[in-house]
Amino acid sequence: PTTGSVEATLEETYFNRTPDHFCSHQHTPNNPGADRAGAVLTKNTGYIVWNVFHDYADKGSYHLKELVLHMIDNLLGDDRSVKVNLPDRGIVTFTKQEDESRYIAHLLFAHTSKRGANIEVIEDIIPLCEIKLDARLPKAPKRVYKAECEDGKIVTTDLDYKFENGVASVDVGKVTMHAMVVFDI
C-alpha cells in the first residue's frame, strides 16, 4: 500500500524464463492480480521503483520518457522556472546574471546523425520556427531580446512579451541551432 498516487504499475509474470521453465513467447504472460506500484507521486516526491534511466538509454522506450516527464511536470506544477516548446533533442538552460541584472535562456537544437556505435555528428543545420518560451522572473523585465551569432557578430532583436503572474511569455520565432533570449530586469 502507498499513500501517494500510483502513476504506473509493475505486472509480474507467471514465472521467469529459464531452461526449466520455458515459454514459446519472448515474454512470459503476466500474472493477473500480481501487480504492484511501479511509480508513485506524493505532494513533494516522486519514486520509480526500477532503473528507468538505464532502461531508457538501453531500449529507448517512449513510454519511459513520458512517465519521467509526467512525474517531473506534476512535481514542479506552476513553479517551473522555464518552459519551451523545443523538440526532444532541444536543450534549454536558464541562468541569472546578477551583476548585469538579467536572466538568459539559451536555446539549443541540433539534429544529429549516428555514425558508428557511439558517434553522433551534426551534418545539417535545421532551423526551428514558432518557438515559444515562458520564464519565471521576480519582476517584469524592462527589455526582452534575442541574441544570435550571424557571420561572427552578435545580432540582437527585440521581442514582444507578455508578463502575467510572474511569468514572461515570449514568441522567440526562429532558432537556428542556438539563440539566447535575454531578460533585462
Walk through the language-model features, giving the residues of each.
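A conserved amphipathic helix/loop scaffold
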Residues: 1-174, 179-181, 185
